[in-house]
Regions:
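Residue-level preference for the first positions of well-ordered beta-strands
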Residues: 10-14, 102-104
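ATP-dependent NMP and nucleoside kinases share a basic, alpha-helical "lid"
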Residues: 64-74, 88-144, 162
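Conserved glycine(s) of the Walker
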Residues: 17, 22
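N-terminal phosphate/diphosphate-binding loop that engages ATP/GTP or pyrophosphate donors
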Residues: 25-74
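Short, well-ordered alpha-helical microsegments
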Residues: 23, 111-113, 180-181
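Extreme N-terminal, non-catalytic leader segments
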Residues: 1-12, 35
Length: 211
């Protein structure tokens, strides 16, 4: 939570990783611990997984609806991942930034690149790495969400996704989940205090310097 007595602009906190490295688990933990942090709820054409709630985990829409949003420039970023389409609605993000609300994104490197083209000054990007390839595969299997073909495809894609690590501001190696959560939380808290984000800082400082 920010303790600054002056208004600041919100930030976009990006977590990316190969499937199974822990970004979704870390995202959920940060949302529980950080009251000023909200989730960017993406739209997707993929079907819901067991337990997922429409409007909370994703907005589940048809491919026609997705194409319409792209055509009308209603998406901040969009990408095709494992045969399904994902995108970030523009309106809620713009409103949050203006109201000092921080938004966390659980997106891949393609989406991150698109956001950099539009809102680079508002971004804080973190890439989550697994401690080893063997551990990544173990985590994918332990989720029991995917069949064997999908697991092989995710492992094949992991090397390509990891190759984009250098495009991110911060790296977290998720060896221990709790430590990784705390590291991500520390990054978020430090970034909130950057001078350029505190929009009312000049007026506040002038008031302190007045006789």
């Amino acid at each position: 939570m920010s303790l600054l007595p002056v208004k600041r602009r919100g930030l976009l906190f990006i977590l990316s990783s190969p499937s199974g490295a822990g970004k979704t688990t870390i995202t959920r933990a940060l949302l529980e611990r950080e009251p000023q942090l909200g989730l960017s709820v993406s739209v997707t054409t993929r079907p819901p997984r067991p337990g997922e709630v429409n409007g909370k985990d994703y907005h589940f829409i048809s491919k026609d609806e997705f194409d319409q949003m792209v055509e009308n420039n209603l998406l901040l970023e969009h990408a095709k991942v494992f045969g399904n389409y994902y995108g970030t609605p523009l309106g809620p993000v713009e409103a949050a930034l203006a109201n000092s609300q921080d938004i966390i994104f659980d997106i891949d490197w393609q989406g991150t690149q698109q956001l950099k083209q539009k809102l680079v000054n508002d971004l804080v990007t973190v890439f989550i790495l697994p401690p080893s390839k063997a551990e990544l595969e173990r985590r994918l299997r332990s989720r029991q969400q995917d069949n064997e073909d999908t697991i092989r495809e995710r492992m094949r894609k992991a090397s390509d996704e990891i190759s984009h690590y250098s495009e991110y501001d911060y790296i977290v190696v998720n060896t221990d989940l709790e430590n990784s959560i705390r590291t991500a939380q520390s990054i978020l808290q430090a970034e909130r205090s950057k001078r350029r984000r505190i929009t009312e800082l000049p007026d506040f400082v002038r008031s302190l310097m007045q006789d």
